[in-house]
Amino acid sequence: MSVANLKDLLAEGVSGRGVLVRSDLNVPLDEDGTITDAGRIIASAPTLKALLDADAKVVVAAHLGRPKDGPDPTLSLAPVAVALGEQLGRHVQLAGDVVGADALARAEGLTGGDILLLENIRFDKRETSKNDDDRRALAKQLVELVGTGGVFVSDGFGVVHRKQASVYDIATLLPHYAGTLVADEMRVLEQLTSSTQRPYAVVLGGSKVSDKLGVIESLATKADSIVIGGGMCFTFLAAQGFSVGTSLLEDDMIEVCRGLLETYHDVLRLPVDLVVTEKFAADSPPQTVDVGAVPNGLMGLDIGPGSIKRFSTLLSNAGTIFWNGPMGVFEFPAYAAGTRGVAEAIVAATGKGAFSVVGGGDSAAAVRAMNIPEGAFSHISTGGGASLEYLEGKTLPGIEVLSREQPTGGVL
């Protein structure tokens, strides 16, 4: 797929031009509104810095969380503007609205090297509307913010699987380019699918089988092994006839898991032991049991030491590794060993020459929470959902639109 990128745009020249950048700045906040993981802000900075250094007038569109009924003060991008400014080493203006009077006035007042962050793009319901006309109307207002000669740079990989106004529709109206982050993510995913070093090991965790069913079915015919951990492993174990106590369970997926185990028995790898406890709490005492001996009334919150050893041995021989989803409730120290053990095994394999990709989301958060150097992996993705959909073989609207011919005048 041929897509114009940031280097192409910089070669054309952006001095004094308006550039609308769709970034993924959807970072987690604690109860006080403090950012707890700035990974996505850090990852978004290189594209923005390159444009600012080239004297562009930069307008950034981004979202935070999922506002339900318009503007929500708890989901304002105000703390993001401060953190982004620290990363860029310059002041980041924050508009008081998305495409209203304040945003337009601030955008018109920009000079080369200035940056304006629009308020949470999802405060405008048209951003995520299923109605094409609604989304296009918002996209046209975004075009007005960058004016004549304006261009669009797509750099929010975490949202390219969404057909949304600031991701998809805007690229049909403005000359469009892939930012550094999006270009790098696509290069890595293409390497995962087209030039895989064998053996190819996939590690999947997280809560629900239903969330990962598509990628399991797709990768089961491509990977040499798929390790199953996290909350989703209990539905697979139940499909094998084991009692899982009060562990997370998707009853309606048991038959599906049974079918997967029958079809891909030589690929799927499940835990052999678990760390269980009475309640979902950090201070609830842990107990290690075999998968066939989970007591009634107890729930699994992590894979056990035997499983860690088994999975680590498998990963030590891998040539390519894709990891998406923690092995347990890593936020609770007593139940973080599984995730840490798998992460360290992937790091060791990477050190021996394996190509390793951490598929964004909770896996990336776990790596940072455990203070494992990000450079110890070949690549850490910023888009868990987008990565999974790509590996499922789905078309990513925000990428597909970048491959189209550049639009010409008359968009307004």
Curated annotation (Swiss-Prot):
| Taxonomic lineage from the root | Bacteria, Bacillati, Actinomycetota, Actinomycetes, Mycobacteriales
The residues that hold substrate are D24, L25, N26, R40, H63, L64, G65, R66, R122, R162
> Quick check: keyword Kinase in the entry?
yes
Decide whether keyword Iron-sulfur is in the record: no
Keywords tagged on the record: ATP-binding, Cytoplasm, Glycolysis, Kinase, Nucleotide-binding, Transferase
Q: Know the name of this protein?
A: Phosphoglycerate kinase
The UniProt entry, under PROSITE patterns, shows: PGLYCERATE_KINASE (PS00111)
Organism's domain of life? Bacteria
Q: Where does this one sit in the cell? A: Cytoplasm
Q: Which InterPro entries match?
A: Phosphoglycerate_kinase (IPR001576), Phosphoglycerate_kinase_CS (IPR015911), Phosphoglycerate_kinase_N (IPR015824), Phosphoglycerate_kinase_sf (IPR036043)
Subunit organization: Monomer.
Q: What class of enzyme is it?
A: transferase
Please list the GO biological process terms of this entry: gluconeogenesis; glycolytic process
Q: Name one Pfam family in it.
A: PGK
Give the reaction(s) catalysed: (2R)-3-phosphoglycerate + ATP = (2R)-3-phospho-glyceroyl phosphate + ADP
* A single GO molecular function term of this UniProt record: ADP binding
Q: In which pathway is this protein known to take part? A: Carbohydrate degradation; glycolysis; pyruvate from D-glyceraldehyde 3-phosphate: step 2/5
Q: What is its EC number?
A: 2.7.2.3
Give the family, as the similarity comment puts it: Belongs to the phosphoglycerate kinase family.
Its Gene Ontology cellular component terms are: cytosol; extracellular region; plasma membrane
Which residues does the annotation say bind ATP?
Answer: K212, G300, E331, G360, G361, D362, S363
| First-listed, main subcellular location of the protein, grouped into a coarse class | cytoplasm
